[in-house]
């Protein structure tokens, strides 16, 4: 009898539980023999993505002609106003611009494949602030001459034949005419603005010197958006766009960008919404802005979807005041900007030792560096590494009210003497603290005093710093791949 009561009690409890879980308006029914069981749809398996095969410099998918297993190539290109227009810059996958001596800037175009470069130049001497950016990637580095600091880096890191010191069999174009109608043949243009090289000469250098161009890259230069997803990162929807730090909004307008490298050298970008790219311009000694063009590509204007600006301390190397050789601090990182699609986003960057790769990060809400790598949209990039002293002059705005016709400052390169090269100078030689016999492996230093270089009159003397650059060379580090 007790068992029967327990069974009845259990049945009543189950009925109450079912009634309590029943949603309003639901009815509980018992399936009959004629009822059809509900169909359960299988969850589709996630689509398997193909292997990630991205161009190391742009993040774009590799094409059929991608130079698999080949080193990237970097070339030093003159950017003093008298050297413009340049050749080959439109072929660059990444274009670096950094201040060198006298307040002028220099370019370092970086190419995925040297065989597609065509003609490039005017080629100029190597500087360590550029070399340290490509050292982790073990790029072929092409220049004409080098500073003593650059020479020492090549020795310390055993760069050997990857440090080419003669413009890769460079040649002189004595008849080239610059933007102002001046030429060496007419006696109105310095020899330094006449050195060029090309794909064939680079190939001949590699072949004749048995340069090892084999290199497998296991990561891309930046943390690019995955091309396989078919998406683009909209900076307006950035994870940082919801807050402002003490310096203002993290994401703001960037249709117009103006970067001040020194009192005499500026670069600006104008956003073209129809092409989703930035057009590049620079200021000239006559007070005008002009498009930055590639005269080897029918004066094609340089454009970039990605514009990256990195601020850091730049000062004269102690003991090199006469030449005003510039030291760029990479050890500590700093604030920068990533501009894309007419917007500019504040970021944090780090590098560290020469063997560590450049890294970009989102900011935390307190303005400090986060641990989240910045996603860069695929495509070509312009990268400026510029003096933090000019950070407050960085302009990023809408195009409303921007005067696109004239410059706000002039360049003063007329008061700056780069080199005192002679017409009979051996190709590849330079008065940048080296003799014509220097090969980049460090055998020779000059026995004669280098040509005196002056800073622009309106800029004043370069700031001196008695603190020697920190030793950045861990003995057990190997280059990143």
Task: Please describe what each predicted stretch is.
Residues 1-4:
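Positively charged n-region of N-terminal signal peptides that target proteins for export
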Residues 17-20:
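C-terminal motif of bacterial Sec signal peptides marking the signal peptidase cleavage site
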Residues 22-24:
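Bacterial signal peptide processing site
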Residues 27:
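Active-site phosphate/pyrophosphate-binding segments
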Residues 30-49, 426, 435-441, 446-461, ...:
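Ser/Thr-rich, Proline-interspersed low-complexity disordered segments
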Residues 34, 40, 44-96, 101-430:
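A surface/extracellular/periplasmic glyco- and lipid-processing/surface-interacting theme
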């Amino acid at each position: 009898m007790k068992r029967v009561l327990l069974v009845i009690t259990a049945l009543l409890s189950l009925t109450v539980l079912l009634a309590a879980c029943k949603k309003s308006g639901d009815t509980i029914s018992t399936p009959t023999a004629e009822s059809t069981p509900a169909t359960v749809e299988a969850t589709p398996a996630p689509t398997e993505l193909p292997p990630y095969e991205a161009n190391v410099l742009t993040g774009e998918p590799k094409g059929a002609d991608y130079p698999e297993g080949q080193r990237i190539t970097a070339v030093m290109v003159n950017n003093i106003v008298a050297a413009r227009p340049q050749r080959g810059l439109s072929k660059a996958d990444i274009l670096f611009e950094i201040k060198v001596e006298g307040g002028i800037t220099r370019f370092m175009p970086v190419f995925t494949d040297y065989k597609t470069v065509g003609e490039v130049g005017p080629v100029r001497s190597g500087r360590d602030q550029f070399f340290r950016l490509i050292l982790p990637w073990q790029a072929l580095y092409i220049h004409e001459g080098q500073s003593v600091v650059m020479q020492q880096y090549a020795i310390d890191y055993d760069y050997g034949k990857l440090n080419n010191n003669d413009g890769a069999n460079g040649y002189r174009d004595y008849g080239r005419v610059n933007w102002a109608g001046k030429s060496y043949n007419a006696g109105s243009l310095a020899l330094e603005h006449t050195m060029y090289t090309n794909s064939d000469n680079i190939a001949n250098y590699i072949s004749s010197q048995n340069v090892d161009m084999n290199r497998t890259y296991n990561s891309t230069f930046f943390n690019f958006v995955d091309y396989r997803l078919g998406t683009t990162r909209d900076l307006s929807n950035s994870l940082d766009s919801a807050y402002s730090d003490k310096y203002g909004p993290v994401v703001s307008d960037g249709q117009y960008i103006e970067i001040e490298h020194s009192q005499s050298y500026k670069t600006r970008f104008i956003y073209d919404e129809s092409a989703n790219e930035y057009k590049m311009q620079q200021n000239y000694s006559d007070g005008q802005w002009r498009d930055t063009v590639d005269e080897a590509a029918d004066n094609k204007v340089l454009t970039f979807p990605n514009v990256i600006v990195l601020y850091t301390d730049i000062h004269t190397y102690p003991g090199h005041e006469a030449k005003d050789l510039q030291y760029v601090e990479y050890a500590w990182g700093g604030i920068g900007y990533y501009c894309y699609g007419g917007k500019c986003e504040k970021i944090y960057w780090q590098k560290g030792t020469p063997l560590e790769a450049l890294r970009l990060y989102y900011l935390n809400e307190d303005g400090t560096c986060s641990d989240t790598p910045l996603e860069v949209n695929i495509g070509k990039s312009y990268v400026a590494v510029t003096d933090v002293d000019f950070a407050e002059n960085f302009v990023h705005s809408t195009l409303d009210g921007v005067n696109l016709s004239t410059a706000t400052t002039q360049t003063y390169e007329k008061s700056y003497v780069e080199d005192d090269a002679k017409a009979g100078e051996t190709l590849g030689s330079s008065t940048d603290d080296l003799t014509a016999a220097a090969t980049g492996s460090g055998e020779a230093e000059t026995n004669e005093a280098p040509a005196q270089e002056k800073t622009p009159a309106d800029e004043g003397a370069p700031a001196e710093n008695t603190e020697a650059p920190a030793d950045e060379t861990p003995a057990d580090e190997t280059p990143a791949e």
